Amino acid sequence: MRRAHYHESAVSAAAEAIYQIVRRIPYGCVASYGQVARLAGLPGRARLVGRALAETPAETGTLPWHRVINAQGRISLTGASAREQQKRLRSEGVVIRKGRIDLRAHGWKAGSDSPLLD
């Protein structure tokens, strides 16, 4: 089976679409990888969101990567990265109980007032 190869500009375009959505997630809210993928026009590409966030170039500026979690309301990262994500979320008032974030309380309702961050 042949692996699909993506043209570099297509990957860059997808990553930029992902970054644009992540920039819109409001302070104190979270979104799932799948939600970000759908809103970026990449339905079913949750793993691509994770990969794009892991490979975020420095020139993208401040990107609130910590606001993206899995669909079960859990942090998917491990080790120091997971601790940093928890720290950042808690500093925004996001409550984490038994390793889970209540998506009803903190989930981003896309379409609400969430302007793009510069």
Describe each PLM feature range.
Residues 2-118:
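Nucleic acid-binding interface residues in structured DNA/RNA-binding domains
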